[in-house]
């Protein structure tokens, strides 16, 4: 307990040993140089004098949580600067995750959950409020334990509450998270549904390239429409009352969620059309409730629940979500396929998905307008045949031009029925065109490699660097960019870090592209010397 909970910056009061020696937390964090607990004094080492009553002195388990020297003791976070990781979270005492004792303790706690319960993954709260060094030890340890339990893939979605892909990509590539929650996806889908901002979704999927490395990509980002903190998709669509088109809008949002890249999650109760608000207002009971405002709260797709159980009520949203989920589960192109944008304008989004292993290809289009929209764009394959698998949109193709008619607040998901490999073999040969490598002006510690693969809509493009004896991959991009600017459209890209390259060995790069028939084409190699720091 501390009376004054205001945050005290390190610059004002640095950590010190019991003998008064300053401790640079950044230098010793999660390392063998971290001062042992015996060198920390509760009265001399911390800016705040924490205390606990005698009755509660040993109440926590594991026992290391009872030692107040295992906490940051700096006061409440201001959610700015260093306090993001060192401050207490709205009064919740912030453990010192830089300490080997704390790191080992949490590894033990979470490992026990895996070994004792057999769980298949974690959703980890407040990930960005913990220092990166902790995650670099903790996350590999969890994967090791899971693998020992026979789990070859053990997802751990970190909650990085930030809607900017550059921020979330940082935690994927530099903090050992291979999965984070995709808050950027959530915000762009809401903007598309409510404000017809298709361009934002097009830009979002271009930014998937930021996640790519030799070990990571955007495939397993956790996608969602709302949650227990921000509120439900129903609340974003119908904050006050239900409009005549709100059911269609809600169904459209779920069609986007369940057909595009990422690992989707449906927030409980959305299938019953719940609305509400933020935080506790988004945590309604589905069983009969005595909370009067929940009894009378408007719902999308059905009437207010009254004293009935949600499980006894029919709602069209449940049927929509169920059918879309069934389609996704049985369709590899939707669960794991590459993705690229073909159209993103005026409240209409058109996306292609492709699975190399099964050579299956899908097109989908979404319309957030109050009237029917007609769009057209070109594909690499002429006169393909398509079959509608979901939604009320219709499609036709003449030569290379695809035309899709999409009713208001609706969608269409179409499967290509043409033999892709057979028909593509008669088309113009694919070629690789490399762009000049350049520094990333948004992050000076990165550079950009980009290339076009002409005459094909989809390719798995492996960017390789040679800064020694052998070529090595720095990432595979499977979805070309979309832009109305020809200089940035149809690009495959990766964003390596400057520190990833041995600049003393005259590094070069090349591209190896895998095509529909699993054949490959390779570019010439290009020097990277001009980027040498």
Functional labels for PLM-detected ranges:
Residues 3-44, 48, 108-217, 221, ...:
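Active-site-proximal helices and loops of the catalytic beta/alpha 8
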Residues 217-243:
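Active-site clefts of carbohydrate-active enzymes
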Residues 511-513:
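Hydrophobic/tyrosine-rich beta-strand signature of extracellular beta-sandwich/beta-rich modules
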